[in-house]
């Protein structure tokens, strides 16, 4: 993992393609261009890059193609990407790592730089008194829940997740 380190988090890019979303992506891609010009470094994504991410075996959420393409270009240019999965995108089952080359983490990521230990965390569920969310998190990450959720068609789960996303 080489410096410089570029850290982004909680972008919540949406699947829909309206002017607002196109403008947000254009700004991000300018940042990516600056990273590529530097020619080296590590991009650390602290979770919730996507507003919703759930993989089926043959299907990933549509509408993210340009984002995935730009992340792949960064990797092809020699930029390492580390992704701490957040509460909106933790249902990655290997696509980001196998198909793009992103190193993914289901929880915190720790590394050393200049004799300092650095911890990157998404932070969801850190509050001990947030009982409701902590219970919800255990349920939606449970393998049985995921198996049941995968029985529904992708369009249904995408629509449901968009509604849930607005409340978290």
Which role fits each region the language model picked out?
Residues 7-8, 117-121, 128:
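Short hydrophobic-aromatic micro-motifs
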Residues 108, 115, 127-129:
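Contiguous hydrophobic, core-forming segments of folded domains
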Residues 123-168:
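Active-site-proximal loop/helix segment associated with metal-binding centers of metalloenzymes
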Residues 1-4, 158:
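Acidic, histidine-bearing metal-coordination/catalytic regions of metal-dependent phosphoesterases
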Residues 3-4, 8, 13-113:
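Core catalytic region of metal-dependent phosphoesterases/phosphodiesterases
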């Amino acid at each position: 993992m080489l410096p410089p380190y570029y850290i982004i988090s909680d972008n919540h890019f949406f699947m829909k393609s309206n002017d607002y979303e196109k403008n947000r992506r254009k700004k991000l891609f300018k940042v990516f261009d600056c990273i590529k010009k530097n020619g080296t470094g590590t991009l650390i994504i602290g979770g919730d890059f996507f507003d919703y991410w759930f993989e089926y075996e043959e299907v990933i959420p549509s509408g993210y193609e340009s984002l995935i393409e730009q992340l792949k270009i960064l990797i092809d240019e020699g930029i390492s990407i580390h992704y701490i999965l957040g509460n909106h995108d933790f249902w990655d089952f290997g696509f980001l790592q196998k198909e793009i080359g992103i190193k993914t983490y289901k929880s915190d990521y720790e590394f050393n730089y200049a004799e300092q230990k650095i911890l990157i965390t998404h932070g969801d569920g850190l509050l001990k008194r947030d009982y409701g969310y902590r219970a919800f998190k255990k349920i939606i990450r449970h393998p049985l829940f995921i198996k049941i959720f995968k029985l529904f068609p992708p369009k249904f789960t995408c629509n449901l997740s968009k509604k849930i996303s607005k409340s978290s």
